[in-house]
């Protein structure tokens, strides 16, 4: 039986529904890491016991939620194994179920982890790349949610710095971090990355339509470097009639509801 990703993902009651951002992040990371000159990263700790055994690069999804970005990365990158971590046992349980439905369990593992304790969990850097879709707002900013899991995913005091520090702990020297963040907070993101000795390498603005301003930015940052940003051509998601643009479908095939780009035989 074919299981189509991202349709019918298991999502706990009261959690933030996964959305387009998670899919865009996965496709951006897969594309840019595959094209990176650091594709030959030397990582003697890559075979961490937290990852399923096997060949390939080691990825970590920080705040993985239901596993949408983890699954998307694995579907787009056949030579990557991934660990997803989240503070919520309910979300980790959902992520494991989703990965199992997609027959990706041999390449992915999930673990409950408080990112403030990442240093104790990763005594030595072990990952080549990291993904993060961190809370976009500080505590008190943005629209509050009545559901605690949903609200925690949206905002948190010092949350952005917490996620970036966790990435620094987990990544090897010159490892690559991929994030998605509101375009309106690009300066805050640059400052947070710089304070943790991550240098921005690429930035991809994302616009809903051709006449719209960017609402998101996808970023590649490198550990132990300084900012040297190359802005990529804007990604425009929708035509005037609301359909996905050819550019968007090429970038993220998971947006094509009529195609089987995310199908896996079960």
Predicted segments with their positions:
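Short glycine/threonine-rich catalytic loop with a Thr-x-Gly-x-Asp
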Residues: 16-19, 65, 211-212
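Conserved beta-strand segments of alpha/beta enzyme cores
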Residues: 8, 81, 107-109, 199-202
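SAM/dcSAM-binding transferase cores
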Residues: 213-266
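Mobile active-site "lid"/loop adjacent to the S-adenosyl-L-methionine
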Residues: 134-163
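Conserved Class I SAM-dependent methyltransferase catalytic core
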Residues: 157-214
């Amino acid at each position: 039986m074919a299981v189509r990703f991202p349709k019918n993902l298991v999502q706990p009651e009261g959690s933030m529904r996964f959305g387009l951002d998670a899919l865009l992040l996965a496709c951006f990371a897969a594309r840019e890491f595959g094209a990176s000159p650091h594709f030959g990263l030397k990582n003697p700790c890559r075979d961490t016991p937290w990852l399923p055994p096997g060949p390939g690069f080691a990825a970590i999804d920080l705040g993985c939620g239901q596993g949408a970005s983890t699954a998307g990365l694995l579907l787009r990158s056949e030579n990557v194994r991934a660990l997803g971590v989240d503070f919520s046992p309910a979300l980790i349980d959902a992520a494991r179920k989703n990965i199992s439905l997609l027959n990706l369990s041999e390449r992915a593992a999930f673990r409950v982890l408080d990112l403030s304790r990442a240093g104790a969990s990763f005594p030595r850097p072990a990952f080549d790349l990291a993904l993060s879709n961190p809370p976009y707002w500080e505590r008190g900013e943005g629209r509050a949610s009545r559901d605690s899991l949903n609200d925690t995913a949206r905002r948190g005091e010092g949350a952005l710095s917490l996620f970036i520090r966790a990435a620094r702990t987990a990544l090897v020297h010159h490892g690559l971090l991929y994030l998605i963040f509101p375009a309106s907070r690009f300066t805050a993101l640059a400052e947070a990355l710089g304070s943790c000795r991550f240098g921005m390498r690429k930035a991809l603005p994302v616009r809903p339509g051709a006449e719209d301003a960017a609402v998101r930015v996808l970023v590649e940052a490198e550990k132990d470097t300084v900012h040297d940003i190359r802005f990529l051509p804007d990604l425009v998601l929708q035509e005037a009639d609301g359909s996905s643009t050819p550019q968007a479908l090429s970038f993220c095939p998971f947006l094509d509801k009529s195609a089987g780009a995310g199908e896996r035989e079960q």
